[in-house]
């Protein structure tokens, strides 16, 4: 199975080669474990995630995969249907007092890439020790996450 490793501010890979729905679900599962284990150590933070994606191919599809896994794992997700930039997710994570933010984006990488960027509760990049915790929870098998979502348009 493909070994997922985070680099600067997240994990990046070529869409449909290594950046697949199955691999995104694996990272979402690891993120959910990190959120559940660590958010309880901060009394003012919710065990919740703000999620957004850029305009690259598959952003909404990959976001849906993240939401399915997070819902299955009991982590609340705040998601804007449509494009949400990294600064928007950072601000939302901070202002809504969520433990983490996730952005489906490859930032400056070529269009064939996508990525999974983690933001911490303060809105900035996730610290290396926390990234290591997330990586330690990435399973070496696929995650079965049925669609248990209810989307509300407001």
What are these regions (language model features)?
Residues 10, 26, 30, 88-91, ...:
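Alpha-helical scaffold segments in soluble metabolic enzymes
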Residues 22, 87, 128-132:
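Generic alpha-helical secondary structure signal
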Residues 1-73, 99, 151:
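An N-terminal, well-structured beta->alpha segment
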Residues 1, 114-152:
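Gly/Ser/Thr-enriched, mixed-charge loops and adjacent short helices
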């Amino acid at each position: 199975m493909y070994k997922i490793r985070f680099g600067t501010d997240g994990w990046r890979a070529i869409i449909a080669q290594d950046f697949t729905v199955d691999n995104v679900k694996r990272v979402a599962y690891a993120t959910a474990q990190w959120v559940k284990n660590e958010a309880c150590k901060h009394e003012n933070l919710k065990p919740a995630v703000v999620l957004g994606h850029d305009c690259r191919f598959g952003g909404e599809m990959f976001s849906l995969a993240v939401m399915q896994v997070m819902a299955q794992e009991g982590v609340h997700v705040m998601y804007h249907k449509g494009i949400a930039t990294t600064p928007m997710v950072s601000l939302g994570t901070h202002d809504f007092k969520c433990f983490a933010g996730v952005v489906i984006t490859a930032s400056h990488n070529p269009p064939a890439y996508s990525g999974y960027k983690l933001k911490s509760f303060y809105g900035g990049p996730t610290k290396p020790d926390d990234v290591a915790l997330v990586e330690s929870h990435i399973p070496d098998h696929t995650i079965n996450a049925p669609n248990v979502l209810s989307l509300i348009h407001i």
